[in-house]
Amino acid sequence: VPIYQVSHLAGLFSSFNTDVIGSLDFYKSGFPARYGSKMSSVVDVNTKEGSFNDFHGTFAIGLIDGRFQFEGPLWKGKTSFNVGLRRTWTETLTLPIFAVMNKFNRPDKQNARYAFSDFNAKITHKFSETNRLSANFYTGRDALRYLNDNLHEHYDENNEVISERDVVDIAFSWGNILGSLNWDYEISDRMSVRNIAYYSGSYSSLSFSN
């Protein structure tokens, strides 16, 4: 399933949450025919199946982000789920910086916020060891906002001070949404069938006010 926005924060962070990745294959060239008409390299990322027997997960908090992953059986031995959520809070670092800047530059106020989040979910059902059906969902979003509040003062014809505010507010967001249904069937040790129905799309929006 193709994904169109493959990174967060201009490539500093991957769109893929490592807590839910089962395998990753990189093909620089000579990749298999199943990747169709791709002209460049291919990165094949597979979300791991959840545990069919017990519940467990991970939780981590870092300086700029937090993540959560949980998996387990919906029907023990037959159906499992795996979900992962990740979000940054870089705005908690930028807000104090701009607060200090605005304190020493009182006529003009500036503020900038950036954050990204992504969510993964996978449900797998085993009809048998060689026949399984899985549903995948992924959504990721980046959001950037910049605010510039300027105070202008000038004198009118009566020599009175006139104060005017000029506010620029820019909001930019972009992301992906993906859903797929996969049916995998192993006919023999050397032959298998995979059928995939999917939707994959990207979006972006920009708003500007003055």
Annotated model-derived regions:
Residues 8, 54-56, 104-109, 162-169, ...:
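Extracellular loop and loop/strand-boundary signature of outer-membrane beta-barrel proteins
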Residues 2-27:
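Short acidic/polar hinge/loop motifs at secondary-structure boundaries
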Residues 47-64:
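Transmembrane beta-strand segments that form the barrel wall of outer-membrane beta-barrel proteins
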